[in-house]
Swiss-Prot record:
It comes from Buchnera aphidicola subsp. Schlechtendalia chinensis. This is Uncharacterized transporter in trpA 3'region. Pfam families: EamA. It is found in: Cell membrane. Residues 16-140, 162-288 form the EamA domain. InterPro entries: AA-Vitamin_Transporters, EamA_dom. Disulfide bonds: none annotated.
Length: 304
């Protein structure tokens, strides 16, 4: 009973933190420049992660023969993707942005099939194709309503999501023995310093202009959405199957959609909503480990 309660709480926490991330970014960016937000977010999170490393006696550095991958994580999992997210988020609706990141499980599945020869079931392939089709239609409609900057924003978000997926997959396959604290602590610190230096050069942030609500949103992004959300998700992955953990990607865009309408009164058209539902259903089909042969065998045995 206690185990089920913990799993349910973890599921709720991760769904809420991920579903509110783009909303919190928008609130924080009301008075804080975007590069500065990201720098503060990573830097604040890194302090707590480094403290946890010392408290739990977890190494900050990767093993000597794997240190280069720690730098790769810093660049391609933190700095570059979040730079692209900042750019894309300026020109793409937050609901559409969350939908783009919702397809990450199927991108990971597809890349696993391509690079690591992981088995891809027939229905997973069908779900993958359908998800790509529905996402393409959704993005085409979003671009149709926008302009050239919207196209660039969509491309930036797709590149950010793909970069995340590649590093996540590679680290899972090759570096699964690395602690999640080690994985995040120093890359967060270095990325935070990088963004703050760039922000100071390009944005010239003035602390006096920061509103209390924007500062609170930044702390929320750092600790609740960042540290707490990430640690909860990785802990959840150890408690449940990959399929059960991946259903969060099905839930958090819906939370974002509801909050977008509740906070700002922004709603999407019924056609676009239907497409999102179809896309989410396709994702569910793709991440569900359904084997047609086993299913047919079950039907035959059932008839007997």
């Amino acid at each position: 009973m206690i185990r089920k309660t913990i799993i349910l709480l973890l599921f709720i926490i991760v769904s809420i933190t991920w579903g509110t991330t783009f909303i919190a970014i928008r609130i924080a960016s009301d008075t804080i420049p975007p590069l500065c937000i990201t720098g503060m977010r990573f830097l604040l999170a890194s302090f707590f992660l480094i403290f946890l490393c010392f408290y739990t006696k977890t190494p900050l550095l990767f093993p000597s023969n794997k240190k280069i991958f720690q730098l790769i994580i810093c660049i391609f999992y933190f700095s570059l993707p979040f730079l692209l997210i900042l750019y894309g988020g300026r020109y793409v609706n937050s609901t559409i942005a969350s939908v783009i990141f919702a397809i990450m499980p199927i991108i990971v599945l597809f890349l696993s099939f391509i690079f690591f020869n992981k088995k891809l079931y027939f229905f997973q392939f069908i779900g993958l194709v359908l998800a790509i089709i529905f996402l393409s239609i959704i993005l085409f409609k979003e671009i149709e309503l926008g302009d050239e900057k919207t196209i660039k924003g969509v491309i930036a978000l797709l590149l950010a999501m793909t970069s995340h997926a590649i590093i996540y997959l590679y680290s899972k396959e090759k570096y699964s023995n690395i602690s999640i604290l080690t994985f995040n602590a120093l890359p967060s610190l270095l990325s935070g310093l990088f963004f703050l230096v760039i922000s100071n050069i390009l944005e010239h942030p003035k602390f006096d202009n920061f509103s209390n609500i924007s500062i609170l949103a930044t702390f929320y992004l750092s600790y609740f959405s960042g540290v707490f959300g990430i640690l909860s998700y990785f802990y959840l992955q150890k408690k449940v199957s990959a399929f059960q953990a991946s259903t969060i990607f099905f839930i958090f865009p819906i939370i974002n959609l509801m909050l977008e309408e509740f906070v700002w009164g922004n709603s999407i058209g019924i056609d676009q909503l239907q497409l999102i539902v179809f896309l989410m259903s396709s994702i569910l089909i793709t991440i569900f480990p359904f084997d047609l042969k086993n299913f047919m065998r079950f039907i035959k045995n059932f008839k007997k």
